[in-house]
């Protein structure tokens, strides 16, 4: 099993989209690569903690490769916009690929380079090692499964 953390705006939609992909073993939403230990949702939304809303993903690479997973991720974000996805604005809504395995870095860089060809503007999606990930409050986990009519900036149909 492999792991990666992806930030693509509001984590509710990212988790729901990713969880529908064959080969995904586990997802959980949380706060990645910020400055405060174990922040609350309110603290993250204030922008002071510098965390990104993100989705931790465990996947079976015999079913889906990291390259395929990243291609799906690129399809649901606008990687040229900083601190905004859909109607959501703030540093917590920035896009990012946070890796746990250093061996994944070359593939991530290659994927980002390929994606650049689709845009005239520069890609601002962060690519960094995962420095920290704090699981979000329980009511955020599987939010759109619990609240099917809930807000989502991603077209899930």
UniProtKB/Swiss-Prot annotation:
The keyword Transmembrane helix does not apply. Disulfide bonds: none annotated. SUPFAM superfamilies: Peptide methionine sulfoxide reductase. GO terms for biological process: cellular response to oxidative stress; protein modification process. GO terms for molecular function: L-methionine-(S)-S-oxide reductase activity; peptide-methionine (S)-S-oxide reductase activity. InterPro entries: Met_Sox_Rdtase_MsrA_dom (IPR002569), Met_Sox_Rdtase_MsrA_sf (IPR036509), MsrA_MetSO_reductase (IPR050162). It catalyses: L-methionyl-[protein] + [thioredoxin]-disulfide + H2O = L-methionyl-(S)-S-oxide-[protein] + [thioredoxin]-dithiol; [thioredoxin]-disulfide + L-methionine + H2O = L-methionine (S)-S-oxide + [thioredoxin]-dithiol. Keywords: Oxidoreductase. One of its GO terms (cellular component) is cytoplasm. The active site is at 10. Its EC number is 1.8.4.11. PANTHER family: MITOCHONDRIAL PEPTIDE METHIONINE SULFOXIDE REDUCTASE (PTHR42799:SF2). Belongs to the MsrA Met sulfoxide reductase family. Has an important function as a repair enzyme for proteins that have been inactivated by oxidation. Catalyzes the reversible oxidation-reduction of methionine sulfoxide in proteins to methionine. This is Peptide methionine sulfoxide reductase MsrA. It comes from Clostridium botulinum (strain Loch Maree / Type A3).
């Amino acid at each position: 099993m492999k792991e990666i953390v992806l930030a693509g705006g509001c984590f509710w939609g990212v988790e729901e989209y990713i969880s529908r992909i064959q080969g995904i073993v586990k997802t959980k939403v949380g706060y990645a690569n910020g400055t405060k230990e174990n922040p609350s949702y309110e603290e993250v939304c204030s922008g002071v903690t510098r965390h990104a809303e993100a989705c931790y993903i465990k996947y079976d690479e015999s079913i889906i490769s990291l390259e395929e997973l990243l291609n799906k991720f690129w399809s649901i974000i606008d990687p040229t916009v900083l601190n905004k996805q859909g109607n959501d604005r703030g540093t917590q809504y920035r896009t990012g690929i946070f890796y746990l395995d250093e061996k994944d870095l070359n593939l991530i860089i290659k994927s980002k380079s390929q994606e650049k060809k689709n845009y005239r503007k520069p890609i601002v999606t962060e690519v960094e090692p995962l420095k920290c990930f704090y699981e979000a409050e329980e009511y955020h986990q599987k939010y759109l499964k619990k609240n099917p009519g809930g807000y989502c900036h991603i077209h899930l149909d």
